[in-house]
């Protein structure tokens, strides 16, 4: 088995933090190496050391049997190591072809850009990924998933020996994901080495040959995928077995808090259900079924065209998110970076953003009270941040999600709507979020949990609503619900 890349004993420290401590990674020709670990385990730092963004404090990097130290991403890319970042890096007002070959445009013999050649080569790359768009289309006109495929095409254009994919399927549809997997299989057949970074265990077992696990910046081990189970992998990542991933809390539900009757509007068609105090109701369904639209409509982010909503026996009209907040309904978006958090602002500013009226007095803000409340939530939610003034964009996905939920709870709501509460969150942080949800439930909060993760819905919910084409197609008690029943109701069987 030919080793293309070998990272051994790498250390990296920042002021007050040892980010990497004896980190190791090997990449083999014709194989996919999963790089696993909780958020904050050191995966991104290791990749930045490899590509020359950070210098290492100790250790060695060998690429194609020679010692290397790249002075930046351009040098590593030119040497044949490409990285496809989780965050998109495209210019919206340029075409697909211009983005793929930016800075490397094909030239004619007289020095002008050879547009025909550039579009031909770009179209070949897109076809290889199953993308049907013309390479002349602007990137701004593409969906997030389609833009991600352009990023992958860009990396493939370098014909690299080693390709690092960081959460490559996060924004992809099932069809796009399968197209990507087909490309990965082709790359394996060409003897290229792939590093696949993902929190999605199902994908790891589906496409990867080997796995390397980091924990707290340390190398825990390298294993062959065929020789381990999901439980083995989780134990390597978090240092303990997660036999009970979904800690369901059994308790009697209280009074009816939210009563939705024949509500329609914005992709929702004649929806009725009740939500009680101290109850978690899961909302399941396929993509486009109307789950997110339901959450946003109840909150006031989308208009209601028919039906009635009663909160604690009082009819309410949420015509805006502010109305929703005023009426005690909080919606935590599935897109915490787009709709949820202001990444350039601090933890404190994000957390108190919708609750400043609680801290206002005679036209000013009681800053000490605000700081104390934020510190209480940081402690209660076990948010890993140096302090309340840390920029929220620098936190891990799990900690960002905790900040988003804390912001909602700070408004003291009656109803908490969680849309994909653990998307992009590692297995250890998921467990913490589930425990927090149970605490809210114990305190009598009414929770509507929208999720595409069926085990999550089944594991945490007291009842499950299944949506299809904007309607509720079925309702199941916790005891009745199974994955088979949920899927059958979602597809209309």
Swiss-Prot record:
Under which EC number(s) is this enzyme classified? 7.5.2.7
Task: Give the record's membrane topology.
Answer: Peripheral membrane protein
* Name of one Pfam family that matches: ABC_tran
Which residues of the sequence carry a binding annotation for ATP? 37-44
Q: Which CDD domains match?
A: ABC_Carb_Monos_I, ABC_Carb_Monos_II
Q: Which GO terms describe its molecular function?
A: ABC-type D-ribose transporter activity; ATP binding; ATP hydrolysis activity
**InterPro entries, alphabetized:** AAA+_ATPase, ABC_carbohydrate_import_ATPase, ABC_transporter-like_ATP-bd, ABC_transporter-like_CS, P-loop_NTPase
Where does the protein principally reside?
Answer: membrane
List UniProt keywords, sorted A-Z: ATP-binding, Cell inner membrane, Cell membrane, Membrane, Nucleotide-binding, Repeat, Sugar transport, Translocase, Transport
Provide the function of this protein.
Part of the ABC transporter complex RbsABC involved in ribose import. Responsible for energy coupling to the transport system.
- Under which name does UniProt file this protein? Ribose import ATP-binding protein RbsA
Q: Which organism is it from?
A: Haemophilus influenzae (strain ATCC 51907 / DSM 11121 / KW20 / Rd)
């Amino acid at each position: 088995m030919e080793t293309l890349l070998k990272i051994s004993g790498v250390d990296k420290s920042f002021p007050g933090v040892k980010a990497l401590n004896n980190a190791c990674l090997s990449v083999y020709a014709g194989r996919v190496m999963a790089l696993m670990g909780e958020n904050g385990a050191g995966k991104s730092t290791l990749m930045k050391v490899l590509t020359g963004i950070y210098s290492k404090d100790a250790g060695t990097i060998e690429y194609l049997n020679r010692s290397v130290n790249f002075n930046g991403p351009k040098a590593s890319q030119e040497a044949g190591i490409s990285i496809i970042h989780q965050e998109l890096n495209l210019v919206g007002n340029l075409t697909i072809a211009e983005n793929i070959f930016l800075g490397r445009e094909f030239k004619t013999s007289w020095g002008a850009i050879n547009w025909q050649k550039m579009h031909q080569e770009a179209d070949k790359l897109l076809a290889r990924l199953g993308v049907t768009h013309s390479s002349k289309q602007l990137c701004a006109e593409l969906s997030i998933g389609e833009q991600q495929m352009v990023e992958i095409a860009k990396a493939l254009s370098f014909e690299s020996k080693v390709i690092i994919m960081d959460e490559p399927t996060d924004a992809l549809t099932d069809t796009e994901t399968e197209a990507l997997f087909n490309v990965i299989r082709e790359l394996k057949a060409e003897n290229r080495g792939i590093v696949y970074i993902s929190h999605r265990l199902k994908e790891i077992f589906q496409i990867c040959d080997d796995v390397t696990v980091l924990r707290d910046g340390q190398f825990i081990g390298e294993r062959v995928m065929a020789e381990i189970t999901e439980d083995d992998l989780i134990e390597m990542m978090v240092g303990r077995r997660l036999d009970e991933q979904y800690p369901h809390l059994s308790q009697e539900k209280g009074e009816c808090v939210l009563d939705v009757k024949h509500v329609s509007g914005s992709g929702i068609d004649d929806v009725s259900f009740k939500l009680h105090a101290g109850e978690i109701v899961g909302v399941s369904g396929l993509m486009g079924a109307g789950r997110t639209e339901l959450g946003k409509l109840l909150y006031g982010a989308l208009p209601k065209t028919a039906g009635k909503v009663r909160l604690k026996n009082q009819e309410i009209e949420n015509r805006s998110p502010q109305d929703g907040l005023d009426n005690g309904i909080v919606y935590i978006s599935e897109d915490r970076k787009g709709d949820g958090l202001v990444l350039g602002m601090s933890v404190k500013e994000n957390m108190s953003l919708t609750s400043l009226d609680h801290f206002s007095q005679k036209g000013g803000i009681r800053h000490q009270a605000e700081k104390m409340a934020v510190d209480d939530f940081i402690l209660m939610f076990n948010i890993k941040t140096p302090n309340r003034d840390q920029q929220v964009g620098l936190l891990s996905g799990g900690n960002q999600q905790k900040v988003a939920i804390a912001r909602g709870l700070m408004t003291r709501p009656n109803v908490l709507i969680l849309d994909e509460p653990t998307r992009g969150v590692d297995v250890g942080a998921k467990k913490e979020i589930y425990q927090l949800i149970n605490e809210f439930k114990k305190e009598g909060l009414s929770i509507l949990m929208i999720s595409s993760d069926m085990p999550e819905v089944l594991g945490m919910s007291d009842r499950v609503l299944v949506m299809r084409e904007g309607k509720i197609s079925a309702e199941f008690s916790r005891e009745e619900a199974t994955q088979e029943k949920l899927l059958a109701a979602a597809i209309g069987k």
